[in-house]
Curated annotation (Swiss-Prot):
Protein task: Mediates the endocytosis of glycoproteins by macrophages. Binds both sulfated and non-sulfated polysaccharide chains. (Microbial infection) Acts as a phagocytic receptor for bacteria, fungi and other pathogens.
Residue ranges occupied by any Fibronectin type-II domain in the UniProt entry: 163-211
Keywords: Calcium, Cell membrane, Disulfide bond, Endocytosis, Endosome, Glycoprotein, Host cell receptor for virus entry, Host-virus interaction, Lectin, Membrane, Receptor, Repeat, Signal, Transmembrane, Transmembrane helix
Known partners and oligomeric status: (Microbial infection) Interacts with Dengue virus.
Ranges for domain Ricin B-type lectin: 22-142
Protein name: Macrophage mannose receptor 1
Gene behind this protein: MRC1
Extracellular topology ranges: 19-1389
Amino acid sequence: MRLPLLLVFASVIPGAVLLLDTRQFLIYNEDHKRCVDAVSPSAVQTAACNQDAESQKFRWVSESQIMSVAFKLCLGVPSKTDWVAITLYACDSKSEFQKWECKNDTLLGIKGEDLFFNYGNRQEKNIMLYKGSGLWSRWKIYGTTDNLCSRGYEAMYTLLGNANGATCAFPFKFENKWYADCTSAGRSDGWLWCGTTTDYDTDKLFGYCPLKFEGSESLWNKDPLTSVSYQINSKSALTWHQARKSCQQQNAELLSITEIHEQTYLTGLTSSLTSGLWIGLNSLSFNSGWQWSDRSPFRYLNWLPGSPSAEPGKSCVSLNPGKNAKWENLECVQKLGYICKKGNTTLNSFVIPSESDVPTHCPSQWWPYAGHCYKIHRDEKKIQRDALTTCRKEGGDLTSIHTIEELDFIISQLGYEPNDELWIGLNDIKIQMYFEWSDGTPVTFTKWLRGEPSHENNRQEDCVVMKGKDGYWADRGCEWPLGYICKMKSRSQGPEIVEVEKGCRKGWKKHHFYCYMIGHTLSTFAEANQTCNNENAYLTTIEDRYEQAFLTSFVGLRPEKYFWTGLSDIQTKGTFQWTIEEEVRFTHWNSDMPGRKPGCVAMRTGIAGGLWDVLKCDEKAKFVCKHWAEGVTHPPKPTTTPEPKCPEDWGASSRTSLCFKLYAKGKHEKKTWFESRDFCRALGGDLASINNKEEQQTIWRLITASGSYHKLFWLGLTYGSPSEGFTWSDGSPVSYENWAYGEPNNYQNVEYCGELKGDPTMSWNDINCEHLNNWICQIQKGQTPKPEPTPAPQDNPPVTEDGWVIYKDYQYYFSKEKETMDNARAFCKRNFGDLVSIQSESEKKFLWKYVNRNDAQSAYFIGLLISLDKKFAWMDGSKVDYVSWATGEPNFANEDENCVTMYSNSGFWNDINCGYPNAFICQRHNSSINATTVMPTMPSVPSGCKEGWNFYSNKCFKIFGFMEEERKNWQEARKACIGFGGNLVSIQNEKEQAFLTYHMKDSTFSAWTGLNDVNSEHTFLWTDGRGVHYTNWGKGYPGGRRSSLSYEDADCVVIIGGASNEAGKWMDDTCDSKRGYICQTRSDPSLTNPPATIQTDGFVKYGKSSYSLMRQKFQWHEAETYCKLHNSLIASILDPYSNAFAWLQMETSNERVWIALNSNLTDNQYTWTDKWRVRYTNWAADEPKLKSACVYLDLDGYWKTAHCNESFYFLCKRSDEIPATEPPQLPGRCPESDHTAWIPFHGHCYYIESSYTRNWGQASLECLRMGSSLVSIESAAESSFLSYRVEPLKSKTNFWIGLFRNVEGTWLWINNSPVSFVNWNTGDPSGERNDCVALHASSGFWSNIHCSSYKGYICKRPKIIDAKPTHELLTTKADTRKMDPSKPSSNVAGVVIIVILLILTGAGLAAYFFYKKRRVHLPQEGAFENTLYFNSQSSPGTSDMKDLVGNIEQNEHSVI
């Protein structure tokens, strides 16, 4: 169900208008007359209802969370179990224990469970979660009959700020205070803002609210010629539907362009931008052509060459400033900026008549309507020019059509026929792609056919026809001989003579066999019906499209909004009936109608003229009465004939005229909605339409007879247009509904077809039309069905010899086995492919439909990766310019869902931990190497680690926690590791475990690993997404050896440390415990590893001892003697650390090794021959086997016994130690200047400009103007931070950075930082003249390009060190400027400006590099510590639409 946004507030907010907040409600139990009362966060009870009590007010703050207005906390439970208390918790959108849903009109329950919101069953004071659904579990909104979900949440999209248009997160925390509404707190200019994450204090992400407040008009640009206002949201990144909603939240719409002047103005307004911006043009309607979302006429075309593309799914249009502001159609799910519009661009004073019954007198054979006369010339076929000449000779012109009412008049009263194709006056002969009426009147209305206007095949289709049953329009070549419609003004100048039409009384209007009268008194539905009855008439019925067209033309031009018809469902909810005993044969619902609430039906006027809405029956409106005209012969009653029969295997009821048949098929034979409809039509029928309960019961009997319980079947329901509701494919009226609760909801804006669930409820659901389902056909009784059509061969695409499916230029492999992502990708690579990258809607549909038809697993890995900084990348390097996320995804659950799967039931995508086994899809090009060829082995590349990190198996590891202050909880530890460019350790095998144990020798703590079961209890996964192929649980773990800790709370895993014989083993622990932790990163090919410290005599230090592996085979006693000769002893292994070290020493020898344990010398008791007590052992299974023997360390790391006269390598032992440190964080704050948003990270502040592109020199100058320089990137952490910040802007631009090449060919940073880190794209740097460097927003990699290119840019400056408290800094901007030390000194800044001016004036980089060598340093800029305080004297306009709030602090732990 779609819910309107109610952006109004209950209290005065500075700068806002005082309005009642209708989002708030009281939760009311009608049976017991009590309301829910939040007494405290731990006590949610009931009390006598009091609308003024804050403690009783609640509000939806997400699709599934309910917040207490008093406490700014959300209703939740500790677990999903029966009879637990419902209390208040800090709102967490990811918590399953805070997600609520309406189960029906009264039941509220925890999502996904039959556990309900309950009070009073067992005399508890608190509200409880309870399995019962009795009277105490039934709730409404106080003062209404509405259910709790009727005041549902709708996202509020932000403007400007630094969150790319993200939605407000309510409640959000600012300066340790929670806000449930937009606020001006922290701002002196009164601008209303919100946080876009729940914790602004940490994340520093925000935007301005789409509300009216003082200064908000400065967000708009007003065209001085037309007074129309435009808002350019270039910094946002939203889908088309999100962008439209954002405009609507400001009482505006996505841009429509109807005049050449308007396009010219907008071209200039967006000239400095380079990325596409959504506009309102779309082809989302199934039944009509290109249209503007604000219903403006589509009369001006400005397509980019090659557009509009006919590719399926590209239904929304963007204006591309980088391509001369031309238009191109794209998939609506792409994320772009957008343009909103307020006002009307029409410059003409033309007035559409406000009534249809103005005085009109016409010549013979002409028909009057609203002051004009009309005539169809159907039989005189003429080319457009000759038709125009004929109309003008008759005193008129080819018809112009200015409203839906006028179009409906032509269809219903002028004798128009469905097979007509008639010239109208619209054409673009005078100005190509700019349609005008030949009579000179302005174009105020268009109604194009699907795919029109087309200018097909670049032909000159300059003239327009109307055709088809609905009279919609298409452009055609003007030389076709066709019929035509003429129109002229009424010739009468005198007062109207009211004519009484034959068969009707005075004041009534005749149409065909009926008389109609407009009731001029505002009345309720019952009053209107009684008034009509008093006139021996009844509230109007509407029998078909043509009567609807007549009534639209009859009342549509009137100023009143609604006119009652005789339709309602007040007798039986969901079944609409006329007030007279007449069958409902036609419906014409408005969008989202008829909905779930019972009511009475009224017909709209105005821009939605003729569409039907369901209103409360006690509302007052005017109405239309109807009766049979006098003298009209009523149609004879049908003669009684034997009822026709249905075919043998079809079902019917005696009260319906239809026969139905189920087609319940196997997975391979199911069909899409369109395929099912075509199948039924090939039989001579259609998909089933259900018009009453009798027909529904007939279908239920067929389901029970065939045993098709719980199967899903297509019905003929389809959503024809965004401006209309559901219709039946056979054209029958939607007079009966049986939607499931909460349906139709148009999930993800792709659910346009209806299905029926084969259970006793027989409920309906809207779903994607491309889904594969069973289906139900219908035919008329007495009709013999035609033979069933032969299945199309395209359902079985060709397959290669090795089992890959061929589709277009690629081959695909669909696995039946489940693997981790690493294993899945390895399989694809071995077969010369990779995990699939999906580049378009059509490719996704192919994959989705294939897995649906072929025994699909529930989900399949695809090749999309999500990095730790939430950037997206295809594994094969393809650009990410198409995504198809499921609702609420990606949700980055537990921050470790870095892989992506495609759901087989919908085709939408979900982020998931890479280590969770799934099926997968591989992809390779048709030209790839034959699969029988051996895949070449890539040579290993030498690599190393940073200082302080330990290298092993091409990875780097570091253990933290040796100092108490280093220890963290699991989440903090993971953030710290991510900040190093890695993650918490994932241990893949015994050798890696031994390496880590070896390095924990001096620990006194246990250390976090990446293993956890946070997302799914008892399913342990590595947080970096690697598969769980090895475990090393300690005794009793996981889930054992708890004291007061509950099993459910122990979700994270540590390696046991300290002086324990189980050191190195794993145990699960509570994630918020403070522990050490182990970070892991990839090794760096640019680094080398220092050799192990080996003493001159071949011994290696470890702990307080030194060891030497003797690589010669001796018997045990010979080995002991040899060690003594070398001033050592045969090695004892006293703890798990030494065991790990010793085993690692054997790694390259592949030989067994004697150790000092022996029972041969000590009366069959195993002891260490160096006299250490045996406190630790690591026996293999079934060991020790021998009573009197010597012990060796085997290749698997375990101890085994052997006769002492066998010969093995041996380990000698003698006796030292090593420390570790961690770098400190840097303090400071960022400046505020002219609404420029600086983003802090470590010791610097960054400004990202994506809307105004510059060449490299201009960008340098812009940064200098702000007291900064083009960014220097000096570490992987800094690179990751910037990549994360610019990735949402990838649809807009790439960004200049401060790296350049001087005349000597040396790469230098503009601020003289050393070039110690680079992140070149593959194949870069390249080109002799490409001397400046840009960062790719989509990948974070760098490319060197020509300095004259226009890009966005990133500025960087040091943080300001200022010890003043925040409250002392809340001064005016004037005060700020007085103390602002950021202005560059004239001598320093002058040099830099001269350098850049040389570049700008063509003196070239050579001169610039000359000045560069003089090492100009930029001074710091002063500003406020709390950068939400701006204190500007004027608000920014579109000409300066830079991000308006600074200090958006990236979480330090996430990137360091």
